[in-house]
């Protein structure tokens, strides 16, 4: 792992790099970025649009860490059953009291970009310690909503009318089923508006998305000194 003060957003010294996620006799891979200070930091698990953490997802994890929020992005693989197992192992990893850098045992968040919503929704349903969720560029279909609605926890939906994958109109129709979820909709912004390695990337939309996510998780996740 590297140790650095990154230029740009945030002020925390951070540790970041490849991380091993233990699960019994097996070990899975992922990317972890966290503040370098001695403290139990608020923590999120991040699921991106691909099975492995992309450069954009890694960058977002580092940004969270510079703002005092640890972020773990697991490499979930292509097999659906295995992916859910790895997602569960990631939750157990950060909730382990031996992870002295994380306050996840007292509550943590999940963040999904595009297709990562399925795994995030599963954790919301099955892991009571998930206390907040956010999704970016992903349609809230009936399958996801059924799982998210099992829990009355704070949620944040961010989508763009210029991004078909956001499914804005369909997602807005489920607001009644998710009464504690805030909906933020951009009038424009192409597919991948949040991802700096996407042709549809928008600096303006990314900055606003970043600020909304940091503010949301900063408000709802526990921090312990």
Where are the regions that the model predicts?
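N-terminal cap/lid segment of alpha/beta-hydrolase-fold proteins
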Residues: 1-38
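Short amphipathic alpha-helix adjacent to the substrate-entry channel of hydrolases
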Residues: 55-81
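A conserved short beta-strand
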Residues: 127-140
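Short beta-strand/loop motif that positions the catalytic acidic residue
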Residues: 151-152, 157-159
